[in-house]
Amino acid sequence: EYSYCDYAIALVAKGLGKTDLYQQYLKQSSNWKNLWRADYEHAGVKGFILPRDKEGNWLDKIPFGNSHIQKPTFTYTPVTFEGPWYTPWWNMFFYEASSWEYALSIPHDVPGLIEQCGGKEKFDERLDIFFDKGFFNVNNEPSFLTPCLYHWVGRPDKSGDRIHEIILSLIHI
């Protein structure tokens, strides 16, 4: 979300003729790639937005709780429902969606996202898995545009099908 906001600021700066600010924020809008972990695999898909510590190391285990004795942790996964029962809906790294959802929420750089995912065919497969395995959550803003991403791989028919499925699931027909 920060990268998208940086992109929006860049566009405003460009419109105001502030070239230096435009360049600065346009560059910052690519920072989502710093959190893209290409080697991480989940549900047969590689590449996710994942947390790093302040030294830049990937965080595979997340500390949870305030115990000074046990220092409890749990292994991080890109979906919240795989965490322990005491894991909050949002944890300290993601606010309102899962890594699966945020990894598809790069609306200002969809071509870059498709490239990170391994090309159009892999991206199409990734979208299928995302929807078929139930990782899509219509209640989360980062997922709102995801059904339309099939357009970017030449499959607007699949976008239409997914949107139709979503509508039917919401009105329970």
Where does each model-flagged region fall?
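Hydrophobic, small-residue-rich alpha-helical packing segments that form membrane-like cores
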Residues: 1-4
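Catalytic cores of carbohydrate-active enzymes
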Residues: 10, 14-151, 156, 160, ...
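Conserved small/polar residues in nucleotide/adenosyl-binding loops
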Residues: 171-173
